[in-house]
């Protein structure tokens, strides 16, 4: 689940 958060964070970045 942490990977998902990191992935979304990268997209928003």
Swiss-Prot record:
Q: Which domain of life is it from?
A: Eukaryota
Name the source organism. Parapolybia indica
Biological process terms in GO annotation: chemotaxis
- Major subcellular site: secreted
Q: Can you say what this protein is called?
A: Chemotactic peptide
Any one GO CC term of this protein is: extracellular region
Tell where it localizes: Secreted
Modified positions (Serine amide) in chain numbering: 13
Q: What's in the keyword line of the UniProt record? A: Amidation, Chemotaxis, Secreted
Q: What tissues has this protein been observed in?
A: Expressed by the venom gland.
